Amino acid sequence: MKVIYVNHTIPLYTHPLLQKIVDKGCELVMLLPLGDNGTVGKGVEVSQSNNNAYRICFSSSSKRWYGKVALMDLKSILIQERPDILMIGWPYMLQFFFERELRKTVKHFNIKLIFQEIPFQTPPFGQLSYFKEHPCYNEDMELISSGIRFKLQALLTMYIRKRIYRLVSATINYATCAYDILPSYGVNKESIFVRYNTGDTDALFDARKQIEKKERMLSERPRIIHVGRLVKWKRVDILIEAFKTVIKEIPDCELVIVGKGPEKDSLTQQVIEYGLDNNVVFTGGIYDPLVLGQYMYESSVYVLAGMGGLSINDAMGYSLPIICSVCDGTEKDLVTDGVNGYFFKEGSATDLAEKIIAILSNPTKAKQMGEESYRVIRDKINLGTVSQRYIDAFNYVMNQ
């Protein structure tokens, strides 16, 4: 079967997954916009691999009158490639609402549509009150879910989504929250496929075997680690604030912050102002999997204070207990509160500090939690299982 997968780019972590999908018998074509159209997050590392089992093609893109980017060559590429399946996400899915000719092309060539999303910042249909309990922020932590204009736009988006869902044969989603949200838009539960999110767990497991044989790289002490882009919505500032309390209870504790980004200077200044510079290490970005893996392996707990990412998966692959808040929903499929980590109250440095102290002060419990983290990655959410969920979705739509 031939699948065209439309995406903003090919993130570094996505490349191994695409390779695995091809290995399972799928002819895969990645369709990307030419150039930087502003849809890729700040600091996202992009795959530079030229050794691809999948093909890559490009389309010119343009911001349309409705305010979102569209692929100008999508129709002609579909006519030329004649795929069995088109897998597409936001905002490119909007083209099927606004462009009648595109809908006609898909119908004429009997192309099955799959909508891929988390879903993130998506309320159940008709429930604008959702945004009171779940306010939306951009990467700079600016509130975007307020005002009459936002409410009208959100209401219109609900009806557009409902129409789009009628056009698709299936949805592929990153998180099980899709089962709670999408049926309210009329989506049949059997057509909802939750694939979860994963990095290259094959490489991670291989790296771990090598690291287990190495001498220690870091001193032996209680160690908190955070990995991610240094942008505001990762809330590293809250982690540093919580660490100020943790260090009073556990004086020899160390906080390692891995990553780069626009917030580096302000976070460094915060550390200095709190007098924590002897206990906080900024490593910058680390892209050698053995070096990053050894930092994980020699740490005691992984903490994500803000918006999620695959670093949770990686930390679990190194048997670390996890502390995070509920953000985009993907973390709820990885972390079971009290079993392999804790959820802390979003935005609360006090609660975060209490959770960190609870883990660091009980090494036996921390080890049990870490073992459970590893089991989740080994058995449930890894390169093999996630790629198979794609294949299951593809087979489902082809058999309709």
Please provide the spans of the model-predicted regions.
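Conserved acidic donor-binding segment of nucleotide-sugar-dependent glycosyltransferases
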Residues: 337-338, 342-349, 358-364
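Donor nucleotide-sugar binding/catalytic pocket of nucleotide-sugar-dependent glycosyltransferases
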Residues: 150-211, 219, 314
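A short, well-ordered alpha-helix in the C-terminal region of glycosyltransferases
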Residues: 252, 351, 358, 365-380, ...
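Short alpha-helical donor nucleotide-sugar binding micro-motif in glycosyltransferases
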Residues: 285, 292-299, 315-316
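Nucleotide-activated donor-binding/catalytic signature segment of Leloir-type glycosyltransferases, i.e.
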Residues: 265-286
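Short acidic/histidine- and often glycine-rich active-site loop of Leloir-type glycosyltransferases
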Residues: 313-317, 327-343
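Acidic donor-binding loop of glycosyltransferase active sites
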Residues: 294-307, 320-321
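Conserved donor-binding/catalytic core segment of Leloir-type glycosyltransferases
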Residues: 4, 216-234, 240-243, 256
